[in-house]
Design a protein with these regions (language model features):
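Active-site-adjacent structural elements in enzyme catalytic cores
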Residues: 1-123
Length: 123
């Protein structure tokens, strides 16, 4: 079992070391608790099936309940989906970063484990 590590980041712009440590944990298959615009969430690398399964296990979440993939900027979207409708671009430009989730056709790069077995991905 992995040891719990507390990293307090009050302002990401002023705590590069903490942000890099959290990123390192994610890159190595670990889980990180993060605040989002609406709730606190348990984050994992969306490309890492074992890490995603660890989120399902930690939360007692059914594996057919898709994860939401969070991205830092709109430029990351094309790697995650096979199509970006014009209205999705307009919404993303207007509301991201912010509490807007869009469901789009998933790229084959996103494991089905992350999408709960669906051919779409929530971003």
């Amino acid at each position: 079992m992995m040891k719990t590590e507390l990293i307090r980041i009050y302002d990401p712009a002023e705590d590069a070391e903490g942000v890099l440590r959290a990123g390192d944990i994610l890159a190595h298959g670990g889980l990180v608790a993060i605040p989002t615009e609406t709730v606190y969430g348990l984050a994992a690398n969306a490309y890492d099936e074992a890490a995603v399964k660890a989120v399902y296990a930690a939360k007692g979440r059914p594996s057919d309940n898709p994860m939401i993939v969070h991205i830092a900027e709109l430029s990351a979207l094309p790697e995650l989906v096979t199509a970006i409708p014009e209205n999705a671009k307009i919404l993303a430009e207007a509301f991201w970063p912010g509490p807007l989730t869009m469901v789009l056709p998933r790229s084959p790069k996103i494991p089905l484990t992350t999408t709960g077995g669906l051919q779409t991905v929530a971003i």
